[in-house]
Curated annotation (Swiss-Prot):
It comes from Shewanella sediminis (strain HAW-EB3). F-type ATPases have 2 components, CF(1) - the catalytic core - and CF(0) - the membrane proton channel. CF(1) has five subunits: alpha(3), beta(3), gamma(1), delta(1), epsilon(1). CF(0) has three main subunits: a, b and c. Produces ATP from ADP in the presence of a proton gradient across the membrane. The gamma chain is believed to be important in regulating ATPase activity and the flow of protons through the CF(0) complex. Its main location: membrane. This is ATP synthase gamma chain. HAMAP family: ATP_synth_gamma_bact. GO terms for molecular function: ATP binding; proton-transporting ATP synthase activity, rotational mechanism.
Amino acid sequence: MANAKEIKTKIASVKNTQKITSAMEMVAASKMRKAQDRMAASRPYAENMRKVIGHVAQGSLEYKHPYLEVREAKRVGYIVVSTDRGLCGGLNVNLFKKVVADVKSQREQGVEVEFCPIGARSVQFFNSFGGQVSAYASGLGDAPKLADLIGTVRVMLQAYNEGKLDRLYVVFNRFVNTMSQTPVIEQLLPLPKSEVDEVSHHWDYLYEPDPKELLETLLVRYVESQVYQGVVENLASEQAARMVAMKSATDNAGDLISDLQLVYNKARQAAITQELSEIVAGAAAV
């Protein structure tokens, strides 16, 4: 058994760690609320953009945009959104597991893959995982802007336009609630047809001035909005996961302190008992 002094030092060390994790929990809680507000503000735009694009895709178009045409999948791209920092539980690990499983399934069918990681953890993972990394972005901070993503996203769009990619997916952690974040893989291109649009009647649109120009702009904005929404959803998920992880660490530190305090008391008791025994033995010898 360690002596009382060593145990006391250990208790002090764990208490200091507990203060740090408790502070990190409070910071994460504050950042999570801001991230939730940002996510809630952008979600209606992303959802309505998806509905509009899905509805347009069902119309009888004079011009058929390449983003609406399904072609044989020979090479697919993944835009994978992760965190820049760690200490957020298994958030990134679960996301990477889902991507790896999907990539394995694609490769078994003879499909090649390439990646566009967003977030330092994603960049680090895919550099070591293997596979072509065509573009990346990191260091977006706690208030990411669409302008910071446009260049990266357009690298993947250019590859799709040139026929180098036949499918494009975005992967991120969807924020469900504080205790639950779900990794999802959503197809961006070719444009997936929503179930609502499939059962509703189709509309014919009159385009002014030109359907090609309109769709070129609208579809690019659609892809950018979906990727941005994935980034802000992932940020809210990150702060929620970090808050939960730090709360768990703080609670575990408290349990460890209680256990160490018990060991310390036993060590003190043993030391005092030994001293008394030595005194009694010395007195008996005299």
